[in-house]
Amino acid sequence: TTQSGNTVIKTLNWMPHIGMNFDLYLDGLSILFSLLITGIGSLVVLYSIGYLSKSEQLGNFYCYLLLFMGAMLGVVLSDNLIILYLFWELTSFSSFLLISFWREKKASIYGAQKSLIITVLGGLSLLGGIILLSLAAHTFSIQTMIEKVSDIQNSPFFILAMVLVMIGAFTKSAQVPFYIWLPDAMEAPTPVSAYLHSATMVKAGLYLIARMTPIFAISEGWVWTITLVGLVTLFWASLNATKQQDLKGILAFSTVSQLGMIMSMLGIGAVSYHYNGTDSQVYVAGFIAAIFHLINHATFKGALFMITGGVDHSTGTRDVRKLGGLLTIMPISFTITVITALSM
């Protein structure tokens, strides 16, 4: 159905008298993210079976992981913005539980608290934007808002709503200056880093930008802000990655830089709303490139994180100054690392 451009909408009544229902909206974008969430999530679950010790609280770990997976699916499938926000905050809560899984490590607790504070505050910003949008469009439905986009653009709340939504997206996807939570979150178990911080949670902000672009792209402020913030994030994080000596630290800043690249591509794609014909198609290529690299990054960066976990288990260190000669002792991992690194 979605291959032919059609969409699937399913409504589950919850509080219809105030316009809050579970409106599930399935199109190409939501299917793509759903496949990433469930596909890579399944691989991470299989990986964690061998990675985590049987003496650890595996039941709790899998419960937290599946809770996060369900929350992410709720984010990408919700058409009602209030429901999307509830799932959005649930991803922050479940990620806190996962990052702090090794509670005996103070660094894990600190990283989890930092992540929770920044992403929850960003979520509150998003909630403010949602409320202002609902005042302008008299609905919480994203698709209905797109149909009423002229009313929203003429509303006095338009600019403020746009800024608040962008802040919510930037905090979740670790854009400058909100990226500071992601490196500290690397104290989580490697399966968590592979899943949350390369394939899913950090992609939620990118999903929100892509989903809300039809509403806000008419504003040059939306286009320029997304593009410039993405480019600044790309270069700043790339520079910081070269200074790291911990493998996960390198991957953390590399992830931030790639998120910035995808964000800037979405900004370039949003320019298509200002042109018609051939000129529009040129900028649409930015959207296509963003989605392609989103899939590419989620797949191969997740693999790099899991290989890093294998190196840590085998050698007892992630310090690149102490690692050498891994080709002879881990030839398969070396080959996979080269392939996945080249994809970046």
Residue ranges of predicted features:
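...captures the hydrophobic TM-helix bundle architecture rather than a specific catalytic motif
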Residues: T1-M344
